[in-house]
Swiss-Prot record:
Stretches with biased composition (Basic and acidic residues): 433-452
Region Interaction with the phosphoprotein, residue ranges: 477-505
Protein name: Nucleoprotein
Motif (Nuclear localization signal): 70-77
Name of the gene encoding the protein in the UniProt record: N
Protein family per UniProt: Belongs to the paramyxoviruses nucleocapsid family.
Length: 525
């Protein structure tokens, strides 16, 4: 049996191992398409700001081809470094594209104000054609800019600080799109807006340079459909992370946005580890979880073997991502989702509609959290040096906290009795009796004469006698006559409920320190 278990463990490890990268054959190269990336040919801020302005206009043009749009976006993404050409050549390693760099310099003879650097060759016409300045079919909006603030005609500046602020604002909006461009493009607008508000409050971006939704949609769609562009963005993130020492402000902002990008599409795997394993509830000892726990262990080892690109496997369309889907460990995932829903309110918005979702193990996770509330782990207590007395105190506090949390989740309980003021005439008898009348009598604990036995005047006197002295009565409303019998019946029902609640309050002993809290819903059932 021991040999079988060792063989099983070895089999699981080898099954989930990544393929070995060595072999007799060379690297497989696909059919490449050419991507032209314009980069500044000098260190002038005017050249960079003018190039940024032209590329932003070019990106929003709906008639631009895919490779040309990718080249424009790569050019924008690399403008914040001192040598964009060296950066692009260093980090680009895509077997499906061939990147060609075109240096751009200022020109007074072209309509775009830019030209391609060349030795003695006039390239103004080619530059104007690239930036679509001689295309009459180009949209008017692309000529006037794509910012929400239409007063901004261009973004050409002479100041390096101003250029960095404008460039950082545009780059922040592009990088935020990567977070959900692949996994959830339909619901990305809300999260992107929250990121924008955050960076606006931190003064990292300038609110006036907010790009229009159409421009952002074009860029998001291009990021979603173009794998070489995503590979370049991931390679740029990793290159920034590997840079030692202090980084430029834009680079630090990209690293901050990266916290929303990493592990995109791996929520099932990460949350199963967080709520299913790290909580260490005794349910992990079930035999049903033994195989899936072994699977998760192999996946965690595989994740580490993949290195720094593991958190981006979904964005990079790595085929190994299918091994990390919840379908490989459905029972443990269902259990972890039940635990997560009970522990964190943010988990309530997750979509559990999967074919492998098991409601029984989902409820198991919920019950484990509820019944384990206030318990202290003996292992953790011994490691942290918590005494038995401290553990009892923690358990007591945790129990009260859990009860308060559950009561808030059910709904607020009212400290005062609220009742209705109906439009009722005293001359119209209320339609009341039967089962509802018995509820009122039982709640008061005493026999009362019904309205039919006492008549209108005696019933009115009885109601007045049993009403609390501090109960505010709306005399104007009560004296109004109504011709609708349903309104009269509802008014009478409300007054009888008030009698019942008044009787309950009279039965409370005067020695009670805290008054009893009632919920109107209990009396309305």
């Amino acid at each position: 049996m021991a040999t079988l278990l060792r063989s099983l463990a070895l089999f699981k490890r080898n099954k989930d191992k990544p393929p070995i990268t060595s072999g007799s054959g060379g690297a497989i190269r696909g059919i490449k398409h050419i991507i032209i990336v314009p980069i500044p040919g000098d260190s002038s801020i005017t050249t960079r700001s003018r190039l940024l302005d032209r590329l932003v206009r070019l990106t929003g043009n709906p008639d631009v081809s895919g490779p040309k749009l990718t080249g424009a976006l790569i050019g924008i993404l690399s403008l914040f470094v001192e040598s964009p050409g060296q950066l692009i050549q260093r980090i680009t390693d895509d077997p499906g594209v061939s990147i060609r760099l075109l240096e751009v310099v200022q020109s007074d003879q072209s309509q775009s104000g830019l030209t391609f650097a060349s030795r003695g060759t006039n390239m103004e016409d080619e530059a104007d054609q690239y930036f679509s300045h001689d295309d009459p079919s180009s949209s008017a909006q692309s000529r006037f800019g794509w910012f929400e603030n239409k007063e901004i005609s261009d973004i050409e500046v002479q100041d390096p600080e101003g250029f960095n602020m404008i460039l950082g604002t545009i780059l922040a909006q592009i990088w935020v799109l990567l977070a959900k461009a692949v996994t959830a493009p339909d619901t990305a607008a809300d999260s992107e807006l929250r990121r924008w508000i955050k960076y606006t409050q931190q003064r990292r971006v300038v609110g006036e340079f907010r790009l229009e939704r159409k421009w952002l949609d074009v860029v998001r769609n291009r990021i979603a459909e173009d794998l070489p562009l995503r590979r370049f963005m991931v390679a740029l993130i990793l290159d920034i992370k590997r840079t030692p020492g202090n980084k430029p402000r834009i680079a630090e902002m990209i690293c901050d946005i990266d916290t929303y990008i990493v592990e995109a599409g791996l929520a099932s795997f990460i949350l199963t580890i967080k709520f299913g394993i790290e909580t260490m509830y005794p349910a992990l000892g079930l035999h049903e979880f033994a195989g899936e726990l072994s699977t998760l262990e192999s996946l965690m080892n595989l994740y580490q073997q993949m290195g720094e690109t593991a958190p981006y496997m979904v964005i990079l369309e790595n085929s190994i991502q299918n091994k990390f889907s919840a379908g490989s460990y459905p029972l443990l995932w269902s259990y972890a989702m039940g635990v997560g829903v009970e522990l964190e309110n943010s988990m309530g918005g997750l979509n559990f509609s999967r074919s492998y979702f098991d409601p029984a193990y989902f409820r198991l996770g919920q019950e484990m959290v509820r019944r384990s509330a206030g318990k202290v782990s003996s292992t953790l207590a011994s490691e942290l040096g918590i005494t038995a007395e401290d553990a009892r105190l923690v358990s007591e506090i945790a129990m009260h906290t859990t009860e308060d949390r559950i009561s808030r989740a059910v709904g607020p309980r009212q400290a005062q009795v609220s009742f209705l003021h109906g439009d009722q005439s005293e001359n119209e008898p209320p339609r009341w009796g039967g089962k509802e009348d018995m509820r009122v009598k039982q709640s008061r604990g005493e026999a009362r004469e019904s309205y039919r036995e006492t008549g209108p005047s005696r019933a009115s006197d009885a109601r007045a006698a049993h009403l609390p002295t501090d109960t505010p009565l709306d005399i104007d409303t009560a004296s109004e006559s109504s011709q609708d019998p349903q309104d009269s019946r509802r008014s009478a029902e409300a007054l009888l409920r008030l009698q019942a609640m008044a009787g309950i309050s009279e039965e409370q002993g005067s020695d009670t320190d805290t008054p009893r809290v009632y919920n109107d819903r209990d009396l309305l059932d």
